Amino acid sequence: MSGNTGERPFGDIITSIRYWVIHSITIPSLFIAGWLFVSTGLAYDVFGSPRPNEYFTESRQEVPLITGRFNSLDQLDEFTRSL
């Protein structure tokens, strides 16, 4: 037989008014904050990923594939120089 840990049962937690008052504010706030983080472009700046219009430049329209096994660093340097 399992012992009592003294924790509140989950059923009591999700049926309490206090739980829903707190979570009815925090869950939509997190959703809105995430939407703003992505829609303003801040996510691109924070993680350093290129924006959708920056994947291909005017000078380079091909996909930057690494094709050589032994000269991959040279190919990477060439791709980054063209940016």
Swiss-Prot record:
Binding site for heme: H23
GO molecular function terms listed in the Swiss-Prot or TrEMBL record: electron transfer activity; heme binding; iron ion binding
Cofactor: how and how many bound: With its partner (PsbF) binds heme. PSII binds additional chlorophylls, carotenoids and specific lipids.
Keyword Phosphoprotein: no
Intracellular or extracellular location(s): Plastid, Chloroplast thylakoid membrane
Cellular component GO terms held in the UniProt record: chloroplast thylakoid membrane; photosystem II reaction center
Protein name stated in the entry: Cytochrome b559 subunit alpha
Primary gene name: psbE
